[in-house]
Amino acid sequence: MSSPDQDPREAIAQGDDEVIDVRRGMFGAAGTGDTSGYGRLVRTVTLPGSSPRPYGSYFDDVVDTLTESLQSNGIEFHQAIEKVVVYRDELTLHVDRAALPHVAQHLRDDPRLRFEMCLGVSGVHYPHETGRELHAVYPLQSITHNRRVRLEVAVPDEDPHIPSLYRIYPTTDWHERETYDFFGIVFDGHPSLTRIEMPDDWHGHPQRKDYPLGGIPVEYKGAQIPPPDERRAYN
């Protein structure tokens, strides 16, 4: 817990890499007659921990400005941001899911930040990261300042709900639907959260790592393609 006199940006301590899995062998090598030696590979799977200050480039300015902007609305930085990661010259803010709309709104509307564009939504599944198995990643672009930042939110399998950013970034409309379709993340507040690529009656979410591979025919039962001027519009 931070003290009252502590800089709120320092309340997020530097963290070690987080080990989420240990993988052994090659793809499908277990129990085979593999004699190459690769079957004995052991690889630790890690996620980067919190990065120390200074972050470098424009990253410190973005974090400082976001801190001030959030505080002006009574939101403490360390309550909204779980960790700040600089990895391979990219800035990622790991956001508490309840604070996601507030953080996105400030990043978009503060004239010193002006991240006007959300470039998409990506889903990630880490089945061995207990309590944080599903991640949603939002790359944001500031056209005004020529800067980029990435937001990342993690939720458990048992409660895969994240607030939709559709009202703030309408471009996330189909991206959130695709992430729901393939990973099962439910974006609360989305105006039309339905499958976008798989059939409506499909069971499961095909890009999760626990989804069975191959051999399932995809059937769009009773599908009819109307003429272009009669096709439904999505929002």
From Swiss-Prot:
Subcellular location: Cell membrane
Catalytic activity: a quinone + NADH + 5 H(+)(in) = a quinol + NAD(+) + 4 H(+)(out)
Keyword flag Transport: yes
Top-level division of the source organism's lineage: Bacteria
Topology with respect to the bilayer: Peripheral membrane protein
Chain's role: NDH-1 shuttles electrons from NADH, via FMN and iron-sulfur (Fe-S) centers, to quinones in the respiratory chain. The immediate electron acceptor for the enzyme in this species is believed to be a menaquinone. Couples the redox reaction to proton translocation (for every two electrons transferred, four hydrogen ions are translocated across the cytoplasmic membrane), and thus conserves the redox energy in a proton gradient.
Name of this chain's protein: NADH-quinone oxidoreductase subunit C
Protein source organism: Mycolicibacterium paratuberculosis (strain ATCC BAA-968 / K-10) (Mycobacterium paratuberculosis)
Biological classification of the source: Bacteria, Bacillati, Actinomycetota, Actinomycetes, Mycobacteriales
